[in-house]
Amino acid sequence: MSKSNPSEVKLAVPTSGGFSGLKSLNLQVFVMIAAIIAIMLFFTWTTDGAYLSARNVSNLLRQTAITGILAVGMVFVIISAEIDLSVGSMMGLLGGVAAICDVWLGWPLPLTIIVTLVLGLLLGAWNGWWVAYRKVPSFIVTLAGMLAFRGILIGITNGTTVSPTSAAMSQIGQSYLPASTGFIIGALGLMAFVGWQWRGRMRRQALGLQSPASTAVVGRQALTAIIVLGAIWLLNDYRGVPTPVLLLTLLLLGGMFMATRTAFGRRIYAIGGNLEAARLSGINVERTKLAVFAINGLMVAIAGLILSSRLGAGSPSAGNIAELDAIAACVIGGTSLAGGVGSVAGAVMGAFIMASLDNGMSMMDVPTFWQYIVKGAILLLAVWMDSATKRRS
């Protein structure tokens, strides 16, 4: 079924000010922002302010990093109208391989990273080859991968935990940026963002297209600067910006660019929106799907490196049901399981919501079974709201 042309989540305030501007703001983004604010206020109140302490915010963002990186890869798979149930087991396997290379084989860190990333690409491409060229449903292919990858992990580790990782390996998931470095990177990123925003506005004006009012652009940029610099300042009050958070930010920006500014990204949306129309328009569907799964494998490899580094070990149970968290993050972020609709920014925001709930309920000592029930209910509510919104529109 053909779908409307999707676009990456925009946090922009529309051209007109006040309430009329809010009307054209993407409803899903507005709901997610409201949900994040509500979650933060609730847990801040129930924990007497400890939830927004510098230490806990740092831990929260580190929790978000792994699921967020998985969601960056998963969102493209789902947009292409496919699914990947193997990412949890694949992450455990790749993290286990990294730990074996580091602990048992004593390889230097650069070689360990390269081998892990290449293996992630190959495993993702393996899934993609079966889906794209052998026409096996992705649900079956990745379900088989989930079982096989877990079995391989248990086999190569002999069912034991591979530890401890080296100090160099631990830097990936446990290190923090110096305070000055965090502010410099944040300032450079904001400068690039401001320049990109004004460049886009001037190009639209030159083409005679409607462009946002200058006051709206300045307001959006000021709000972004306050949020970014405020977050860096808060994180520096503890130990600094965690390295996994920096990696997630870079992958988020790269994913957003690929989704909105490249022909490859547009092909992914076209395939998910209407497969036959995409094929008739000249898109190489098989090659595109293969590339999507390979990219997903690369994201899983990065997440696996961070996980093993953060744990200081490779565990046979690592990554268990992580694929469900990644899928839930994408769905909560507005990605349609039917394909053709979704955004990288929304998926990462969904991952942040999931991590916020985990973190807050853990601080409140909520029993584990209730945590699963709450997350399941929120996932169901998010899908229902998305379906209800589409029916009304």
UniProtKB/Swiss-Prot annotation:
Membrane topology category: Multi-pass membrane protein
Keyword Hydrolase tagged: no
Main subcellular localisation: membrane
Record-level GO cellular component terms: ATP-binding cassette (ABC) transporter complex, substrate-binding subunit-containing; membrane; plasma membrane
GO MF terms, alphabetically ordered: transmembrane transporter activity
Positions of transmembrane segments: 25-45, 65-85, 103-123, 136-156, 176-196, 215-235, 240-260, 288-308, 313-333, 337-357, 366-386
Keyword terms: Cell inner membrane, Cell membrane, Membrane, Sugar transport, Transmembrane, Transmembrane helix, Transport
Membrane topology, Periplasmic segments: 1-24, 86-102, 157-175, 236-239, 309-312, 358-365
Residues on Cytoplasmic side: 46-64, 124-135, 197-214, 261-287, 334-336, 387-393
Family that this chain belongs to: Belongs to the binding-protein-dependent transport system permease family. AraH/RbsC subfamily.
Protein name per UniProt: Xylose transport system permease protein XylH
Organism: Escherichia coli (strain K12)
